[in-house]
Amino acid sequence: MKKIGAHVSVSGGVEMAPVNALGIGADAFALFTKNQRQWVAKPLSVESVTLFKENCEKEGFDARYVLPHDSYLINLGHPDEEGLEKSRAAFLDEMQRCELLGLKMLNFHPGSHLNKISIEKCLDRIAESVNMTLDKTTGVTAVIENTAGQGSNVGNEFWHLRYIIDKVEDKSRVGVCLDTCHTYTAGYDIVNEYDRVFTEFDEVVGRNYLCAIHLNDSKKPLGSRVDRHDSIGKGLIGIDFFRRFMQDSRFDDMPVILETPDDTIWRDEIKMLRSFES
């Protein structure tokens, strides 16, 4: 069975995330543990941490199905030393927040070369950043999200993900989150070549590294390298893909997170997706 949820609001504090997830009928959720558009945030209070854990237990959310996301500002492959150090400090803070909350994963966008260094050099910096962070933390897996390849973002090709993983020293604490919109607009035809794409992922990256799914339709076409999510079945990926995905046991027992644009229909989307399983 799939564990389905969405990226829910933490307005009122991180402790509200499990409450908001329950409100849409979810059994998984994603959240930001701080303002995603600010470099620095005040530390999590003891009260917020305690309430978050209590609410997760009360509402029945297992930490294995909670997928926190780091700040959009962070670029672990930054070509400039100042930007790189700033990103590394912020990423460490995010990882430490996950530790405090008792969470098992931190999802992140790998980074961008900003047309100043090669793809390989950028990937090297990302892996080094992950290694530095894992050395200073325990119990939290760094989960690399594939990208659409917009601008100078890396992570749009499966080999990029494998390259980073190969250079991470603690293989037990690195994984991948596949975003269906990003996969499609990066040029992988999950609509017409479903089996081939996921077989390629298994061969290049390794299914054992797959930790989570971001389940989104796409407003932009195959190979466009533009990241614009759409509601399930309303975009160019189409409903048949999502029906097939929900019946594919390879994606059981991991958080499947909606980042679709209309949060007023998340409950309906989750209900529809669950109906495809039976």
UniProtKB/Swiss-Prot annotation:
Q: What are the UniProt keywords, alphabetically?
A: DNA damage, DNA repair, Endonuclease, Hydrolase, Metal-binding, Nuclease, Zinc
Q: List the disulfide bonds.
A: none
Please list the residues that bind Zn(2+) 2: E145, D179, H214, E259
UniProt lists the family membership as follows:
Belongs to the AP endonuclease 2 family.
Q: Which residues bind Zn(2+) 3?
A: H182, D227, H229
Query: Pfam families under this entry?
Result: AP_endonuc_2 (PF01261)
Tell me the InterPro entries matching this sequence. AP_endonuc_2, AP_endonuc_F2_Zn_BS, Xyl_isomerase-like_sf, Xyl_isomerase-like_TIM-brl
Q: What is this protein called?
A: Probable endonuclease 4
Positions contributing to Zn(2+) 1 binding: H69, H109, E145
Q: Which cofactor does it need?
A: Zn(2+)
Q: Where is the signal peptide?
A: none
Domain of life, per UniProt, equals Bacteria
Q: Does the keyword Metal-binding apply?
A: yes
**Assigned EC number:** 3.1.21.2
The gene designation is: nfo
Q: How is the cofactor bound?
A: Binds 3 Zn(2+) ions.
Catalyses which reaction(s): Endonucleolytic cleavage to 5'-phosphooligonucleotide end-products
* Claim: Repressor is one of the keywords in the record: no
A GO term for molecular function: DNA-(apurinic or apyrimidinic site) endonuclease activity
According to its UniProt entry, one GO biological process term is: base-excision repair
Cited function: Endonuclease IV plays a role in DNA repair. It cleaves phosphodiester bonds at apurinic or apyrimidinic (AP) sites, generating a 3'-hydroxyl group and a 5'-terminal sugar phosphate.
